Each structure stands twice: as C-alpha cells, then as structure tokens.
Amino acid sequence: MTLVPMVVEQTSRGERAYDIYSRLLKERIIFITGPIEDQMASLVVAQLIFLEAENPEKDISMYINSPGGVVTAGLSIYDTMQYVKPRIATLCLGQAASMGSLLLAAGEKGMRCALPNSRIMIHQPSGGFQGQATDIEIHAKEILNIKSRLNYIYVKHTGRELSEVVASMERDNFMSADSAQDFGIIDKVIEKRLDIDV
C-alpha cells in the first residue's frame, strides 16, 4: 500500500484536508510517476481536460518521474497534451524513460526542463506476442508502424533529422540532463526554481 501524504489548509469555513496530489492539481501541477499504463493515463488525460476547462489561458506544469510503459497509454497523454489549449511545461525529476521521455519532449518549446541528476532514456518500442503465424505477422507490422510514428514524434519535438532519431533509438539510449538538452528533448537544465520561468 502506498502512503499519500495529506495537506491540511485553514479556510474561513474551517479546516480542509487534501491528498498532496489533489492540492498540487489546484496549483495546475500534474504528476506522472511510475509506469505509464491505461488507468494512470486516463487520470492524467482527465486532469489536463479539467485544467483546460477551468482556465484555458493558464499554463500547466507536468512533473515526470517514470520508467515508461504502455505505448498506447502514453500516446493518449501525448495527444491530449497537444490537443488542450494551455501551454504545458514539462520537468523531469528522477527519470523519464521510454514513453516518459516522449512526454517530456512534448512540452511547450522553451518550457521543457530537467533537474541536473535526471536520467532520460529513449529507445524503440518493444512487445511480445504469441499465436498463429498470421497473427504474429499482423502484430509485427503494428509494432513497426508504432516505431515509425514514435520516430516522427521525436523528430517533431527535438528538431533532429529522422536518420539521427532512428539511429539513436536503435537500442536503449540513456542520457544525462545535459545530453538530453543537446539532443533537443529538453530546453534547459535547472538546479533551482529561480532558474525557470514557468
């Protein structure tokens, strides 16, 4: 069981207790922590849409510490990030691997950051399937289509040539925060909150 801290606020109506993530959501901060899977993606998508409805002009911050996860779940978050009107600042603390790195790169240009000891990892998608030969062939084609789609998303957000992205994602490619900045996944490495404008 995971322990989630509670925050108690004093208001004119008395005390009110929030779990820490709900309190941070009031400040327009969304956390992506742990593996990216369907339930977590649905929560993040709902938070993005809620914050847009609340104020479509005010920026949203997304803090990422994730080893990655299910590609389709990650792409649902990615598509929603591109769909909503508010600008989304992304910040890696800890790690942003696999789909986590794609979400990090998908933030608003100029507002994508990482803390100095963060680790970022990109790679091609992986998957496994068993069954009849025809079904295996269908799934192999699908994973190649997804690989191509992910490559183009990284090209769009990093400004790198397709050939560079393909070569860089051939195997697990771990990067420091500085290397991720050089690659174009983030715009800035920050040590203190004062270093960031979001």
Swiss-Prot record:
NCBIfam families: clpP, PRK00277.1, PRK12553.1
InterPro entries per UniProt: ClpP, ClpP/crotonase-like_dom_sf, ClpP/TepA, ClpP_His_AS, ClpP_Ser_AS
S-S bonds: none
Reaction catalysed by this enzyme: Hydrolysis of proteins to small peptides in the presence of ATP and magnesium. alpha-casein is the usual test substrate. In the absence of ATP, only oligopeptides shorter than five residues are hydrolyzed (such as succinyl-Leu-Tyr-|-NHMec, and Leu-Tyr-Leu-|-Tyr-Trp, in which cleavage of the -Tyr-|-Leu- and -Tyr-|-Trp bonds also occurs)
Species this chain originates from: Ehrlichia ruminantium (strain Welgevonden)
Top-level taxon in the UniProt lineage: Bacteria
Protein family (similarity comment): Belongs to the peptidase S14 family.
Keywords, ordered alphabetically: Cytoplasm, Hydrolase, Protease, Serine protease
Protein name as catalogued: ATP-dependent Clp protease proteolytic subunit
General function of this protein: Cleaves peptides in various proteins in a process that requires ATP hydrolysis. Has a chymotrypsin-like activity. Plays a major role in the degradation of misfolded proteins.
EC number(s) given by UniProt: 3.4.21.92
Active-site feature positions: S98 (nucleophile), H123
UniProt lineage: Bacteria, Pseudomonadati, Pseudomonadota, Alphaproteobacteria, Rickettsiales
Principal localisation: cytoplasm
Location in or out of the cell: Cytoplasm
Any one Pfam family match given in the protein's UniProt record, by short name: CLP_protease
